[in-house]
């Protein structure tokens, strides 16, 4: 059970990229027990990213139909959504903004969409409100995860809110001096040729993300 099976590289946004060693058994185990669903899912995120692997493993565990774009231009993605009646689109706020700017959503029928999930970067409140205007029947869900700890289950306060709860049975969270700390069953075994300085001795990962807490338990990252 304690064998490495996956190496992901960090983005290197705060220094040299780090090679992160994951236990693949633990990652795969977190997707067990999911029910089959008759949905069409567009695979948007790349597989060198924890979010892309999350999309792939989720789809395989539920036996859903996957659509793979040749590239990620808004026009092409919108065309695929119309052609294959895509139900779920995972994307970044930047890409969703490009869809609106390009008006690809006006040239193609995207009414099959039931859910748009977003993450990897902050979602501006103003953009989320615009998206809800153009996609009023779509549920918007904010996702959260890190390459070090994996993707956690989340619940958005509402489709037009950027507040969320991390309510994953495999994930613990706490807020220390305004910073989000995470401890999960799917976190890395270690780094190649690099220290674990962002982890505490008892396994908490210091994400570096500052959060705003609401009185009802939701947080804004």
Predicted features, each with a name:
Residues 4-32:
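Conserved AMP-binding A3 loop
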Residues 161-167, 201-203:
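Short Gly/Pro-enriched turn/cap motifs at secondary-structure boundaries
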Residues 73, 94-96, 123, 187:
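Alpha-helix capping/helix-boundary segments
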Residues 181-221:
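Conserved ATP-binding/catalytic segment of the ANL
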Residues 28-40, 48-88:
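Conserved AMP-binding/adenylation subdomain of ANL enzymes
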Residues 88-90, 103-161:
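Gly/Ser/Thr-rich phosphate-binding loop
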